[in-house]
C-alpha cells in the first residue's frame, strides 16, 4: 500500500501577555474557551492534523510567554518556525505598538534564511469585548502597519466566540507551506516486520 506523506509545520504565536494567544490556540485546536486567565510560563504547544489540497499536515502551534523575562527562551523555540503569528489586543494600544518589537525579536532569534520573505500573519484579537466599544486600535491603522511590513496578512478575531479563527489559521497554514522550511514525515501504511537475516553493509556506497 502507498505511504502517506505528512508534513510538519511549526507555527509560533507571539505577542504581549494577555492578548489571547493561548485562547486563540485552544479555540482553533480544541474549540474551547476559558474565561480564567492563566499566564503561559515559558512556552507550550498543541498539534492539529489538517488536510489541505489533498495533503496531510501536522500543525505544531507554539504559544510563548509574553513576559520579557522569558524572551531569552526564544532561540530554542523560534528556530525552525515556518510561520510567525503576531497577536495584539484591539483594546490595547500598547500591545499593538509592541508588534514591531516582537517581529524584530523573532527575526533576530529565529534567523530565517530569507527574512525579507518570511511569512508572518497578524491577528487583532478580542473584537468582542464590550461589543467593540472599548476598541482603541482601528482596523485601518492595523492594516496600514501590515502593509508597511510587506503586506502581512491581517485578521481580526474573537477567540471567545470563534470569529475568524478558522480563517486566520487557514491563512497561517497556507503561508507556512510556502516557507519551504517544512519537515516531512513519512507514514507507511504497513510495516514489514517479517524480514529475517538482514544483510550487513560492509561499506558505504556514496
UniProtKB/Swiss-Prot annotation:
Record-linked Gene3D superfamilies: P-loop containing nucleotide triphosphate hydrolases
Topology in membrane: Lipid-anchor
InterPro entries linked: P-loop_NTPase, Small_GTP-bd, Small_GTPase
Source organism per UniProt: Arabidopsis thaliana
Protein residues bound to GTP: 15-22, 63-67, 125-128, 158-159
Pfam families: Ras
Gene name for this UniProt entry: RABG3E
Biological function: Intracellular vesicle trafficking and protein transport. May play a role in adaptation to stress by recylcing macromolecules in specific cellular compartments.
Induction info: By hydrogen peroxide and infection with an incompatible race of P.syringae and B.cinerea.
Keyword Glycoprotein included in the entry's annotation: no
Cysteine methyl ester PTM positions: 206
An example Gene Ontology biological process: response to oxidative stress
Note: Plants overexpressing RABG3E exhibit accelerated endocytosis, increased tolerance to salt and osmotic stresses and reduced accumulation of reactive oxygen species during salt stress.
UniProt similarity note: Belongs to the small GTPase superfamily. Rab family.
Primary subcellular site in the record, as a coarse category: membrane
Lipid-bearing positions (S-geranylgeranyl cysteine): 204, 206
Localisation per UniProt entry: Cell membrane
GO CC terms: Golgi apparatus; nucleus; plant-type vacuole; plasma membrane
Name of the featured protein: Ras-related protein RABG3e
Amino acid at each position: 500500500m502507498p505511504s502517506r506523506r505528512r508534513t510538519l509545520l511549526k507555527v509560533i504565536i507571539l505577542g504581549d501577555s494577555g492578548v489571547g494567544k493561548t485562547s486563540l490556540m485552544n479555540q482553533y485546536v480544541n474549540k474551547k474557551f476559558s474565561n480564567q486567565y492563566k499566564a503561559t510560563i515559558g512556552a507550550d504547544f498543541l498539534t492539529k492534523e489538517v488536510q489541505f489540497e489533498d495533503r496531510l499536515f501536522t500543525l505544531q502551534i507554539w504559544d510563548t510567554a509574553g513576559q520579557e523575562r522569558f524572551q531569552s527562551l526564544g532561540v530554542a523555540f523560534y528556530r525552525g518556525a515556518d510561520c510567525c503569528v503576531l497577536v495584539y489586543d484591539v483594546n490595547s494600544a500598547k500591545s499593538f505598538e509592541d508588534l514591531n518589537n516582537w517581529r524584530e525579536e523573532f527575526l533576530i532569534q529565529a534567523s530565517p534564511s530569507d527574512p525579507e520573505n518570511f511569512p508572518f500573519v497578524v491577528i487583532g484579537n478580542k473584537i468582542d469585548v464590550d461589543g467593540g466599544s472599548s476598541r482603541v486600535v482601528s482596523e485601518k491603522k492595523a492594516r496600514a502597519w501590515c502593509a508597511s511590513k510587506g503586506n502581512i496578512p491581517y485578521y481580526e478575531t474573537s477567540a471567545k466566540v470563534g470569529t475568524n479563527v478558522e480563517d486566520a489559521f487557514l491563512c497561517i497554514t497556507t503561508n507556512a507551506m510556502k516557507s519551504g522550511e517544512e519537515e516531512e514525515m513519512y507514514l507507511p501504511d504497513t510495516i514489514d516486520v517479517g524480514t529475517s537475516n538482514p544483510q550487513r553493509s560492509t561499506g558505504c556506497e556514496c
